[in-house]
Design a protein with these regions (language model features):
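A cross-family phosphate/adenosyl-ligand binding-site feature
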Residues: 1-72, 78-144
C-alpha cells in the first residue's frame, strides 16, 4: 500500500506501447522526471548502450540520457552475460541506475507478492516516492 500523500506522484506513472514511437517519451520536449524500463532484457540493455533506438523503450532511454534525466533500468536476466554486464557497467558510468529485479530474502518473504513488492520498493526509493511496501532496515539483530 502506498502512503496517501504520494498517490499523486504514482498517478503520473504512464505505461506506453513499446511499438509507438510517436508516444511522448520518444521526444526530448516531453518533460519527465524519470524514465523506467521495467523489465528490460539483455538485448534492450545492449541496444541502449550502443545508442540504438528501434522501439519506444530504447528511444525513451536514449532521450533520458541526452536530456540528462534519471534513467532506471530493471534487468530481468539471470545469469548476466559478460556483454550485458559490460553494457550495464558502461551505462552506470553515465549515471544510469541499474536495478536488477532481484528481491532480497533477508526479510523472509512469504508470498510472490512480497518478492515483487521488494523490487517495486527499490524502484520507488530511487524516485524518492515514500511507500510502505517493505520494512526499512533497522540495524537490529535478528534471530536466525
Amino acid at each position: 500500500d502506498m502512503v496517501p500523500e504520494d498517490l499523486s506522484k504514482i498517478e503520473r506513472v504512464t505505461l506506453h506501447d513499446n511499438h509507438n514511437l510517436a508516444a511522448k517519451p520518444a521526444s526530448g520536449s516531453a518533460k519527465y522526471d524519470a524514465y523506467i524500463v521495467c523489465p528490460t532484457s539483455g538485448t534492450t540493455i545492449g541496444k541502449i548502450a550502443a545508442g540504438i533506438s528501434d522501439n519506444l523503450a530504447t528511444r525513451s532511454a536514449l532521450v533520458a540520457l541526452k536530456e540528462r534525466r534519471k534513467l532506471i533500468l530493471v534487468p530481468r536476466e539471470a545469469p548476466f552475460a559478460t556483454a550485458h554486464l559490460e553494457a550495464m557497467a558502461k551505462m552506470s558510468t553515465w549515471g544510469v541506475i541499474i536495478l536488477p529485479a532481484s528481491p532480497g530474502f533477508y526479510h523472509k518473504p512469504n508470498t510472490i507478492d512480497e518478492l515483487i513488492d521488494f523490487v517495486v520498493a527499490r524502484i520507488l526509493d530511487q524516485l524518492d516516492i515514500n511507500h510502505n511496501l517493505s520494512k526499512r532496515w533497522s540495524g537490529e539483530e535478528v534471530d536466525h
